[in-house]
UniProtKB/Swiss-Prot annotation:
Keywords from the UniProt entry: Membrane, Transmembrane, Transmembrane helix
Protein name as catalogued: Uncharacterized protein MJ1288.1
Record's bilayer topology term: Single-pass membrane protein
GO cellular component, one term: membrane
Compartment list: Membrane
Regions crossing the membrane: 1-21
Lineage of origin: Archaea, Methanobacteriati, Methanobacteriota, Methanomada group, Methanococci
Primary site of residence: membrane
Length: 123
């Protein structure tokens, strides 16, 4: 009887360890998704701000190849990152305007200043 009790206890502990490990693993996957979205957001924001700064001198076109591995939708004064069913929206103030576009890779960023508004087209 003593061996049966130990066996049942060992199976219960093993089951709890498996559940605990799978929970931690799924949490790490979620954290990884948000880290990737944050990386893409920082990269796009950095390139947009570089184009805005350079557009103060006149119309500017930056040619830079950036593989995003996700879908990005540019519209009005924001862009939306869609990665593995997670959505993140980054809004700029009203003086930055994007031409409507949906991309998965960036190859060219064009920016032109019209009055106090920066018109940005991203391909």
């Amino acid at each position: 009887m003593h061996i049966i009790a130990k066996s049942i206890l060992l199976m219960a502990v093993s089951f709890l360890v498996i559940i605990f490990t799978s929970t931690i693993y799924s949490e790490l996957i979620e954290i990884g998704k948000y880290r990737y979205i944050d990386k893409v957001d920082r990269e796009i924001t950095s390139e947009v701000m570089n184009a805005v700064v350079l557009a103060n001198e006149g119309n500017i076109t930056l040619y830079k190849k950036i593989n995003l591995n996700c879908k990005v939708i540019f519209e009005n004064n924001s862009f939306t990152i869609i990665f593995q069913n997670k959505t993140y929206v980054h809004k700029f103030n009203n003086n930055i305007r994007f031409f409507k576009n949906e991309i998965s890779d960036i190859s060219k960023i064009s920016c032109k200043k019209v009055n106090n508004t920066y018109m940005i087209y991203i391909e």
